[in-house]
Amino acid sequence: MERGKTPEAAHALLVMLKALRAVRHLALTPILKAGLGESDFRVLEVLLHKGPLPVNVIGPKVDLNPGSVSVAVDRLYQKGLVSRMESDSDRRVRTVSLTEKGRRVFLPVFRQHAALIKRAFQDVSPKERRQMEEVLRKIGKRAEKLSEPARHR
């Protein structure tokens, strides 16, 4: 079944990407106004919710590669928003935590970010949101399966 000249699945992808772009732009507004980048936000958010973490644990939790985590942590450290502590038992391991200043600066940004996302979803019922999550999860898993052979070439 074609929709104009765009296949239905491709059209659905375009709709999804446009919505994602709009919500992402909205959600980034308070982050950028606070002088933070998206990577900075991800690192601060995981530290807020999970507490102090080793640098190598942060990346997988926030979908950032190790280099991006290091750059973000360095930037946040220079701003006084995080502290870094080397492990006594293994000097290669550095644990990162939010400082009081980091918590004071980040909490209002996080609250604004969360409120904007909530407003973006206000016309979506809880049932529709659950259905959307289920469908997106299904699509994501299928796409991962389809890309597995390409990864092993």
Summary of predicted features, one role per range:
Residues 1-34, 81:
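N-terminal leader segment of winged-helix/HTH proteins
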Residues 10-14, 34-45, 67:
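Short alpha-helical elements of helix-turn-helix
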Residues 50-54:
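Short capping segments at the starts of secondary-structure elements
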Residues 65, 72:
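Helix-turn-helix DNA-binding motif, specifically the short coil turn and the N-cap/start of the second
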